[in-house]
């Protein structure tokens, strides 16, 4: 999914890749992994987002895919979960040994000021070129797609591991009423669960 943010003369185009799949080797997961690998090579800057103080086997696998020469920022998200800031220093040293990160950005993605600071850090890495999208565009996806992803995300959030990762939300009918969207009714529940 492409996210677009235009601030002044700068346009940020974020490529949100699916998570790298290490547990299952299904055709879907292989396809998702191929998408991740393709996206990593076609960007001007990589934002490697991990939970502050944590590093998983899946994180290590993704990190091993990064091509040299692409600036990479280590984004330590959920900094509020680290009780003492001094606890982060050994983790940060370990991360620097794993990869030559260009910069370290501690933050909380829930804080608007942290997001603005991150955009300010990213801006100098972007090439000077014409914009790819209009100033008011937020994504390259349709509203129908965004609605289906919102429903899917809510299903995962409220059902946890009960819902298989391969689940898909299909919207049969999508009505736009003014500035309000009417989300579809959930039907054929038996088709949702295997």
Pin down the residues of each PLM region:
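Non-catalytic alpha-helical coupling and interface elements of nucleotide-dependent molecular machines
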Residues: 6, 41, 45, 67-71, ...
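Canonical P-loop GTPase G-domain recognition
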Residues: 70-73, 80-145
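Short, surface-exposed acidic/glycine-rich loop or hinge patches that mediate macromolecular interfaces
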Residues: 26, 53, 109-112
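P-loop NTP-binding site
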Residues: 143-194
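Conserved C-terminal guanine-recognition region of P-loop GTPase G domains, centered on the G4
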Residues: 5-12, 30-104, 175-179
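Conserved substrate/cofactor phosphate-moiety recognition/catalytic segment
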Residues: 1-2
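Flexible beta-alpha connector loops of hexameric P-loop NTPases
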Residues: 20-29, 80
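Conserved active-site aspartate in kinases
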Residues: 16
């Amino acid at each position: 999914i492409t996210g677009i943010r235009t601030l002044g003369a700068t346009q940020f185009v974020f490529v949100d890749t699916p998570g790298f799949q290490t547990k299952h080797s299904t055709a879907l997961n292989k396809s998702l992994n191929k998408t991740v690998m393709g996206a990593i090579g076609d960007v001007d800057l990589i934002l490697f987002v991990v939970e502050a103080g944590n590093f998983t086997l899946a994180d290590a696998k993704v990190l091993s895919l990064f091509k040299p020469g692409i600036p990479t920022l280590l984004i330590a998200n959920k900094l509020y979960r680290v009780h003492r800031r001094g606890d982060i220093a050994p983790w940060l040293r370990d991360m620097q040994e794993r990869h030559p990160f260009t910069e370290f950005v501690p933050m909380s993605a829930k804080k608007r000021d942290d997001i603005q600071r991150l955009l300010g850090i990213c801006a100098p890495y972007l090439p000077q070129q014409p914009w790819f999208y209009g100033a008011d565009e937020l994504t390259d996806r349709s509203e129908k797609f965004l609605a289906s992803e919102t429903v899917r995300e809510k299903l995962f959030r409220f059902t946890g591991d009960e819902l298989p990762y391969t689940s898909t939300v299909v919207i049969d009918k999508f009505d736009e009423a003014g500035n309000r969207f009417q989300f579809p009714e959930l039907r054929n529940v038996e088709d949702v669960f295997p």
